[in-house]
Curated annotation (Swiss-Prot):
Family of the protein in this entry: Belongs to the universal ribosomal protein uS14 family. Zinc-binding uS14 subfamily.
Membrane-crossing segments per the record: none
Keywords noted in UniProt: Metal-binding, Ribonucleoprotein, Ribosomal protein, RNA-binding, rRNA-binding, Zinc
GO CC term (a single one): small ribosomal subunit
GO biological process: translation
Gene encoding the protein: rpsZ
Annotated binding of Zn(2+), by residue: 24, 27, 40, 43
Gene3D superfamilies (UniProt xref): 30s Ribosomal Protein S14, Chain N
Cofactor note: Binds 1 zinc ion per subunit.
Protein name: Small ribosomal subunit protein uS14
The organism of origin for this protein: Mycoplasma genitalium (strain ATCC 33530 / DSM 19775 / NCTC 10195 / G37)
Length: 61
């Protein structure tokens, strides 16, 4: 889980736009964030298995 200080730091506007980075809206993780859904891969997996994301299901071939 992300530290509280990092979440606060990310919510403030950056001085330079290059410093912007995405964080998971659910847990605050900074890596492996799926921009289309706004959550990290771990939260995406949990939500997909729970059926909370419409149109997403486990692939098998």
């Amino acid at each position: 889980m992300a530290k509280k200080s990092l979440k606060v730091k990310q919510s403030r506007p950056n001085k330079f736009s290059v410093r912007d980075y995405t964080r998971c809206l659910r847990c605050g993780r900074a890596r492996a964030v799926l921009s289309h859904f706004g959550v990290c891969r771990l939260c995406f997996r949990e939500l997909a298995y729970a059926g909370a994301i419409p149109g997403v299901k486990k692939a098998s071939w």
